[in-house]
Amino acid sequence: MNGQNIRIRLKAFDHRILDASTKEIVSTAKRTGATIRGPIPLPTHIAKFTVNRSPHIDKKSREQFEMRTHKRVLDIVDPTPQTVDALMKLDLAAGVDVEIKL
């Protein structure tokens, strides 16, 4: 796989699970002899929601919720066939969204 890069984008709501999955991918890729760029932390997307506390009166009384989406990017430069096989067999934690681009 000469001259090809693999870009892996990871998304999760919990940054601890995301960092653990990133470390797992990095250690697997290094063990198989590939070079890695990253992990690069991307900006955290924060979605905020404001709702009324009461169902019908007290418009001034509101409650705010937020949902944070943490993201990381990894680039694997010149992966070996063993690297691709190891990444395919890797079992990551639930709650981590993985996008792989060649």
Swiss-Prot record:
GO terms for biological process: translation. Pfam families: Ribosomal_S10 (PF00338). Transmembrane segments: none annotated. Keywords: Ribonucleoprotein, Ribosomal protein. One of its GO terms (molecular function) is structural constituent of ribosome. One of its GO terms (cellular component) is ribonucleoprotein complex. InterPro entries: Ribosomal_uS10, Ribosomal_uS10_CS, Ribosomal_uS10_dom, Ribosomal_uS10_dom_sf. SUPFAM superfamilies: Ribosomal protein S10. PANTHER family: 30S RIBOSOMAL PROTEIN S10 FAMILY MEMBER (PTHR11700). Belongs to the universal ribosomal protein uS10 family. Part of the 30S ribosomal subunit. Involved in the binding of tRNA to the ribosomes. This is Small ribosomal subunit protein uS10. It comes from Methylobacterium radiotolerans (strain ATCC 27329 / DSM 1819 / JCM 2831 / NBRC 15690 / NCIMB 10815 / 0-1). The lineage of its organism: Bacteria, Pseudomonadati, Pseudomonadota, Alphaproteobacteria, Hyphomicrobiales.
